[in-house]
Amino acid sequence: MPEPAKKAVSAFTKKPKTTEVAAGSTAVFEAETEKTGIKVKWQRAGTEITDSEKYAIKAEGNKHSLTISNVGKDDEVTYAVIAGTSKVKFELKVKEPEKSEPVAPAEASPAPAASELPAPPVESNQNPEVPPAETQPEEPVDPIGLFVTRPQDGEVTVGGNITFTAKVAGESLLKKPSVKWFKGKWMDLASKVGKHLQLHDNYDRNNKVYTFEMEIIEANMTFAGGYRCEVSTKDKFDSSNFNLIVNEAPVSGEMDIRAAFRRTSLAGGGRRMTSAFLSTEGLEESGELNFSALLKKRDSFLRTANRGDGKSDSQPDVDVWEILRKAPPSEYEKIAFQYGITDLRGMLKRLKRIKKEEKKSTAFLKKLDPAYQVDKGQKIKLMVEVANPDADVKWLKNGQEIQVSGSKYIFEAIGNKRILTINHCSLADDAAYECVVAEEKSFTELFVKEPPILITHPLEDQMVMVGERVEFECEVSEEGATVKWEKDGVELTREETFKYRFKKDGKKQYLIINESTKEDSGHYTVKTNGGVSVAELIVQEKKLEVYQSIADLTVKARDQAVFKCEVSDENVKGIWLKNGKEVVPDERIKISHIGRIHKLTIEDVTPGDEADYSFIPQGFAYNLSAKLQFLEVKIDFVPREEPPKIHLDCLGQSPDTIVVVAGNKLRLDVPISGDPTPTVIWQKVNKKGELVHQSNEDSLTPSENSSDLSTDSKLLFESEGRVRVEKHEDHCVFIIEGAEKEDEGVYRVIVKNPVGEDKADITVKVIDVPDPPEAPKISNIGEDYCTVQWQPPTYDGGQPVLGYILERKKKKSYRWMRLNFDLLKELTYEAKRMIEGVVYEMRIYAVNSIGMSRPSPASQPFMPIAPPSEPTHFTVEDVSDTTVALKWRPPERIGAGGLDGYIVEYCKDGSAEWTPALPGLTERTSALIKDLVTGDKLYFRVKAINLAGESGAAIIKEPVTVQEIMQRPKICVPRHLRQTLVKKVGETINIMIPFQGKPRPKISWMKDGQTLDSKDVGIRNSSTDTILFIRKAELHHSGAYEVTLQIENMTDTVAITIQIIDKPGPPQNIKLADVWGFNVALEWTPPQDDGNAQILGYTVQKADKKTMEWYTVYDHYRRTNCVVSDLIMGNEYFFRVFSENLCGLSETAATTKNPAYIQKTGTTYKPPSYKEHDFSEPPKFTHPLVNRSVIAGYNTTLSCAVRGIPKPKIFWYKNKVDLSGDAKYRMFSKQGVLTLEIRKPTPLDGGFYTCKAVNERGEAEIECRLDVRVPQ
């Protein structure tokens, strides 16, 4: 008995066990866990149990209990207790309370098994206290072990039969399970199979269920007790216990119809003996059943049988035809025995004709099909055709009439057609439907097929910071569908901490992580029964980047000062400090936070606002500082007629550079003095010193401009617009709103009055974020990685590029995911952790001190794929003088790129140059390399190719010499050809014999030493086998065939025997040897043509001259003489005999020429005056035992024939040892033919076997030798 598979370590130190309680009582299950504080769940039939009046759940420390109150039959299911990953299943069995008055059986005869009883008539009601079979509860399906149905306890009366059935699920089993039946603890019942015990098994291919049965025949009191059924597979084991109760047969004074059956046997002195029961265990019953008494009293027997069944005399007789019609064929003989049927074969023939006459429907012209199938959500029409167009039709669902309700069901009547339309089919519509017209019904079954759940909107990759909320969202094709979430291949469940939350909203499915951690990074998968979607989650530590810092400002009184900075996280808040103290906003001081930009605005600047200002992001160790300087303009007293002067640090000798960020406002205040008030002119000068713009309509050189400008010349800049000049008495203001790159350059300011002029050059530099780089290029694509390359942007924004930021997204997604937080300094990056087979795109950002550029165009879509692994099992299959045959198996890992083919190369020994062996790629896993040079030593290798490139090479380690290998010829004879091949006339013979040998051997066939005729027998040869083909076998094809292989001087020969058989001819010389009383003795001789096969027996039939209907008297009868008894007085009978061999019965029969007349009884019989002849004789073997040589492992029989009066007792010996108690041997005796069957003999079973026959007149014995050969 195989040991059960070892289980993983359980969280339970004490497990609940299967318990049996009485109905109405209380059941308690207890469990103990290894640790305290573990949450324990209880389940009933897969559904979690909650605390209620019915179920009480308690937990104290590590002890847990489940109490079920008022146990009923509905509670007899499978329960389970779960702690962590451990799950223990157990059962609750409910037994009915014992009854005070047991129901006595109705019949005195032994009660057969419930499965063997024929269906009784509808009106019978033998025992009102026993519920009918239809109301019995169904056997519970076993969800724990291997059993689908366990054997149940049984009860039988002495002499009755009972069958125990066990069903095992075979869907997950690779081969048939092993089943053993035991009585008590250790008694294996396989060794007890015989007259009273039979074991059966079968396999249902449709339901994939193995059925094993143990049948107990003619039970006696010693059979009662406990039994066990054990089933085991390679890695699983289960067992089930059941009990058998055997009741004594009740005493009844009524007539037992079986007492009318008598077996007649010959006793010494020629007297005929009748006995109700002559057989004993181990011996065959002798004589023949006498049904003559029943012929005259059939009606009385039927009434007696009815009384035996507990019926009243007023009830009608049993309809034996109805019982036979409903009963299975295996019950026919039992019914015939029970109800006194004498001509069972005749009744069965008539019953067969009755069954063929199917009753035609009068109400329906066309019925419903047996079954229909429809997809969920679709509609279906069920249609019938009725004979009467005015007939009323009812439609039933699961036995309940369907009522009109909305648009769900539509009833239509079109002529003779009646149509039921079911709209929007759901799983609730999967049921049995009936159409009822008057008293006739038409049945069908509707199966609603649920389509697979598809993922219509897949998951998207996400990148978050530690502590942020993560929400994965996908959309499926069905509302409320069940999906499974996994992280890195491990299923996610609702934990006690509720780390993961699952949410459904219509067709949308959500996975929510409230507070993400670094450990949450990974690949998340959502699975349905029709699709899979994968997304990646990257959780980064919080890191703040400053895209734009605050700058120092110099402003005048009553001007506006604006400090602005930009950080990477728009959710980060911060505070502003002035000389270390927090700035409090008021009407003049404003603080704003819009997105990633933080601003501090000071209106109407005063000298008190001059200070150091700082911005501190909340939660980060950053301090952004800048200084605000207050410019106080002091104008000294200038006498009248003073030349103009520009009060700047730069007086035109060296350019002063003013830097402004693109998009910001540039305000340049230039203090001036002079009397009279000078005229201000602004000009923009290019790098060569030429005037870009001028104040007059004519072009002026710088020298001309400086000397010839007048006060009434046209000004370059307007007082309104994006670029403008504001004039004041003591200063002028140059303003650029939203500085742009084109505003960069040298600006010249000229002040002039009649007294003189002054000028100054101011350099304005506009800095900006870089231009977006060009689209990145993808290279070096692997299984989950790739290399990204890009070029610097064409314009860096006037500031050096600090680094780059890379983003990635799936082709079908809209969400870009950032791959790096630290700026990339290099122009290449290796992206990892991608999913093979998914299409991605990349884009790049350039970052300088001002900020981040716009994204680059997306790269070309690409798919991470990897080359396959190298092919496996690369070997040389065959070598010839110019060819080498190679074979291999596909790579273990192919990947999402598939497999385009293989490339095969070879290299000469000592060389490093590999030469392609085949033109292009081959898709096969074998190759024949041709046109090689004989004698070369070559290395071979093979590579697998797909979109990603070549795999590693599988190389043959040793060089292969191109030269034919001589191999001795050897014929491999199939097992079924090692013994005589028997075929019937007309069948096709196709014999294939494989062989080995190189070079290709010469093949020759012979029959009985003569060459085969090619016109009659076909021969086809190949390099590995030879085939003998006969399209239509005839008797002359029988014989010994020899096939010979020859390679030079080496040969191998095998002989095959073919036997063609045909039906035998009829027996010869049949005659009536004697007619006496109600008996006729027949004799005949064997047929002249035995059909080339041994005659197995004869079939004897009789026919009354009046009806000439033939009835079989004997089947498989071996002797050439017989006595037909129990003939009817006054009738004339003809007799015929068929011969039988392996092909079947002969086409014609030998028939007696003259009828045998059974004379009527006359005067009283006067015994003869002479002494009666003594018919007794000592045993004598009429057919000897034959020496045999058999193959081990196949059942073998030894047969002989004996005669003797009285019937001798038979003993079998092996090497003088009695075999009576050995279960390996089975002994049979039928009509004088003795057979010893040896089950699967081994070489140890060889030896001398002796058969000994003993009776009161003497004894005889015969011996043979048995050799057991081991198959080669």
UniProtKB/Swiss-Prot annotation:
Residues 102-117 have a biased composition (Low complexity). Expressed specifically in cardiac muscle among adult tissues, but is also expressed transiently in the skeletal muscle at early developmental stages. Isoform Type I is found in embryonic skeletal muscle and isoform Type II is found in both embryonic skeletal and cardiac muscle. CDD domains: FN3 (cd00063), Ig (cd00096). GO terms for biological process: cell adhesion; regulation of cardiac muscle cell contraction; regulation of muscle filament sliding; sarcomere organization. GO terms for cellular component: M band; myosin filament. GO terms for molecular function: actin binding; ATPase activator activity; myosin heavy chain binding. Pfam families: fn3 (PF00041), I-set (PF07679), THB (PF18362). The modification Phosphoserine is found at residues 265, 300, 1169. Residues 137-252, 359-451, 452-542, 543-640, 644-763, 969-1057, 1179-1263 form the Ig-like C2-type domain. Substrate for phosphorylation by PKA and PKC. Reversible phosphorylation appears to modulate contraction. Residues 95-147 are annotated as: Disordered. Residues 772-868, 870-965, 1066-1161 form the Fibronectin type-III domain. The modification Phosphothreonine is found at residue 274. Keywords: Actin-binding, Cell adhesion, Immunoglobulin domain, Muscle protein, Phosphoprotein, Repeat, Thick filament. PROSITE patterns: FN3 (PS50853), IG_LIKE (PS50835). Belongs to the immunoglobulin superfamily. MyBP family. Thick filament-associated protein located in the crossbridge region of vertebrate striated muscle A bands. In vitro it binds MHC, F-actin and native thin filaments, and modifies the activity of actin-activated myosin ATPase. It may modulate muscle contraction or may play a more structural role. May be involved in the early phase of myofibrillogenesis. This is Myosin-binding protein C, cardiac-type.
